[in-house]
Amino acid sequence: MSDPVQPLLDEHAQLQRELADPAVHADAGRARKLGRRYSELNGIVEAHRRVERLSEDLEAARELGSMDPELAAEVKPLEEELAVAREALRRKLVPRDPDDGRNVILEVKAGEGGDESALFAGDLLRMYMRFAEQSGLKTEILSSTPTELGGYKDVQLAVKGSSSDPSEGAWARFKYEGGVHRVQRVPVTESQGRVHTSAAGVLVFPEVDEPDEIDISQNDLKIDVYRSSGPGGQSVNTTDSAVRITHVPTGIVVSMQNEKSQLQNREAAMRVLRARLLAHQQEQIDAENAAARKSQVRTVDRSERIRTYNFPENRIADHRTGYKAYNLDHVLDGALEPVIASAVELDEKARLEQLGQDSAEQGSAGRRG
């Protein structure tokens, strides 16, 4: 069976040569993509070097152990280290989500529950912004529809990363958040002290690096302008600065009203539209590939309830992974890492199982051939 690592080592070396060429950096988009792939392969190269180094040390210890008791004593620890290193390399070989290094557009929408749902949407927004800050990511509110009580009917947030490591990218951290988030608590409007259940929906899209990455024909767009409104629906602008863009072929609609100028709102709306169209393309690919859809937590139905936030018990529970903890106050303050880590672990486990099945099928086919 061919070595699955060698082609990746060759690719890493080739990328290193290309990135050293100043001409490559004249095309910022191409340089960014090459750099992202290079950073992804760095982990595989380092893991492979460690396996090779430990293999050499183990071979030397075995050969010289009969003459040197100290070297003989190193054999078992080296065997254990090598086993761990090989498993780490195997995990690195599991194909990453190619979008991990991308920035994201995150949307939070109030669901059933009226004012309480809108307030919870605001809680989720603050949680995500604090988590992003703690993760070294930058955030920008693109559009929002606030309510009179301080919540949001809907809000769109851009999250941007700066690390060259795809595993630390905005999409790598936020892609598991899409779905229905349920809250159980006593609403501020509840006079009887009864616990109510409401929900908010979260959509997460990888953002397009360059505008021309997604081909959008102007003939496919329907653009409407109107006056922006504030809490309660009252008009807050005397000019038609708000923009609504409809992508006719897909039916995707994006509205923007946060900026004061129509041009700024249009640019922001196109930014979100490109992200949605990129996600739409990926969903079509996933729909044609059942194995890919099954192996990724991020592709669960967005209408699925993924998490419950129980305030009376201070409990957070993720229904996909089984994660449960009684530190809801800390999670809402941005301590979301353990919750997301449980989704990453589940996704990685599924990918490893799929990799094992693929390897077994290839081996069986090779023996038959």
Swiss-Prot record:
Top-rank lineage group of the source organism: Bacteria
GO molecular function list: translation release factor activity, codon specific
Name the record gives this protein: Peptide chain release factor 1
InterPro entries: PCRF (IPR005139), Pep_chain_release_fac_I (IPR000352), Pep_chain_release_fac_I_sf (IPR045853), Prokaryotic/Mito_RF (IPR050057), RF-1 (IPR004373)
GO cellular-component term (any): cytoplasm
Family as reported in the entry's similarity comment: Belongs to the prokaryotic/mitochondrial release factor family.
Subcellular compartments: Cytoplasm
Key word Cytoplasm present: yes
Described function: Peptide chain release factor 1 directs the termination of translation in response to the peptide chain termination codons UAG and UAA.
Originating species: Kocuria rhizophila (strain ATCC 9341 / DSM 348 / NBRC 103217 / DC2201)
Residues found modified as N5-methylglutamine: 234
Post-translational modification: Methylated by PrmC. Methylation increases the termination efficiency of RF1.
SUPFAM superfamilies registered for this protein in UniProt: Release factor (SSF75620)
Alphabetical list of SMART domains matching this protein: PCRF
Disulfide bond annotation, renumbered to this chain: none
Alphabetical keyword list: Cytoplasm, Methylation, Protein biosynthesis
